[in-house]
Amino acid sequence: MSEQKCEITHENEVIKICNYACQLLRYPKLNIEIMHRLKPVTKGRGYVLGYTNLKKNLVVLDVYTARLRKPKKISAILNVLAHEITHHQRPPYRQWHRGRWIIRQHYPRFYKQVNKNIVKIKKDKILKQYFA
């Protein structure tokens, strides 16, 4: 019988780690997907590190660097994941500001929650090895 090698790719490893982090942050039903870019990001343009869909419970993360398409460090991916999970914990709301309605997506309470999530991830005995 031939032995099959079970290689763990960077994407599979990231999905497993992110699913564990979601359980740690009490959002086990979030679906994690990997963003696949068709071409590298050009110089001087903004680019997306990840995005979330609140209705579908979906988080999409970019696990490769923008230009050279090399695998990112797990700690950087976990920081983006903490930010995206916070969008589910502190959803955006509408606010009347200077005579018009605005949608507050990123606000001080939001960023406090992001920092709390990152601290929880860093305190975990399994995930703290990626921040060393």
Walk through the language-model features, giving the residues of each:
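Basic nucleic-acid-binding interfaces
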Residues: 96
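Short alpha-helix carrying the canonical HExxH Zn2+-binding catalytic motif
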Residues: 73-86
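Active-site scaffold of zinc-dependent metalloenzymes
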Residues: 38-73, 88-92, 102, 106-113
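Auxiliary, metal-adjacent structural segments of Zn-dependent hydrolase domains
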Residues: 8-55, 121-130
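Short alpha-helix boundary/capping elements
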Residues: 85, 89-90, 118
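Hydrophobic beta-strand residues in large extracellular and virion-surface proteins
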Residues: 32, 59-61, 81-82
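Post-HExxH zinc-binding segment in Zn-dependent metallohydrolases
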Residues: 99-132
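A short, highly charged nucleic-acid-interacting micro-segment common to nuclease
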Residues: 2-13, 104
